């Protein structure tokens, strides 16, 4: 693993994560099963919106959760802004290949999101998320409020043993979901 903890070291960590996940066999069903158990225990999850995502290649596919919960997904606008919309809305393919709600779909108020399921290239045991570098989730997550559980979703093979570089705009996760289940972040 790269050892550089400086913010510029994120590029090395991204390269490490992309190489590591190439050909990685993720047990999507195990991750989803752990998330079902977790969501069933979260106060307000059944009545609120669960923010999930439509996966990029190499990310855990959470579409199996969609029928069981009131789920929302993001739409990425040209300037990089993420908005939140019902997951059952009509979709179009984003230029990066994932499905997203079509333009004009009604938005879900961020205040109505009760749990956020967040993808990433890698995570560390302290909740630091390493994204793709565009800052989309860095801008979205703070607007959800401090009490919303933020669950980093990944393969256990992409959870580092050491701290990832972190910058002031990075929003830490409160939980990690892997094939081994969902666990609270250690402090």
Model-derived regions, located:
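Short polar/charged helix/loop
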Residues: 133
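Alpha-helix N-cap/helix-start and coil->helix boundary motif
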Residues: 57-59, 78, 123, 137, ...
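Surface-exposed, charge/polar-rich loops and edge strands
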Residues: 1-13, 19-23, 102-107, 111-116, ...
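Short beta-strand segments
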Residues: 53, 74, 118-119, 152-154
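N-terminal start-of-chain detector that recognizes signal peptides
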Residues: 44-45, 88-91, 122-123, 146-151
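Flexible loop residues that form catalytic
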Residues: 55, 121, 181
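N-terminal active-site beta-alpha-beta segment that forms phosphate/nucleotide-binding
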Residues: 2-112
């Amino acid at each position: 693993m790269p050892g550089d903890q400086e913010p510029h070291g994120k590029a090395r960590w991204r390269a490490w994560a992309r190489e590591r996940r190439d050909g990685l066999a993720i047990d999507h069903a195990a991750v989803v099963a752990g998330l079902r158990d977790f969501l069933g225990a979260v106060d307000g999850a059944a009545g609120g919106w669960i923010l999930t995502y439509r996966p990029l290649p190499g990310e855990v596919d959470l579409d199996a959760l969609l029928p069981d919960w009131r789920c929302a997904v993001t739409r990425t606008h040209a300037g990089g802004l993420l908005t939140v919309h019902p997951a059952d809305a009509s979709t179009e393919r984003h230029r990066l290949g994932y499905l997203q709600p079509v333009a004009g779909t009604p938005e879900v108020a961020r205040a109505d999101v009760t749990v956020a399921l967040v993808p990433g290239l890698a995570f560390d045991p302290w909740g630091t998320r390493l994204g793709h570098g565009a800052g989309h989730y860095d801008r979205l997550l703070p607007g959800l409020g401090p009490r919303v559980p933020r669950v980093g979703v990944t393969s256990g093979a992409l959870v580092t043993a050491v701290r990832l570089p972190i910058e002031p705009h990075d929003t830490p996760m409160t939980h990690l979901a892997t094939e081994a289940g969902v666990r609270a972040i250690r402090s």
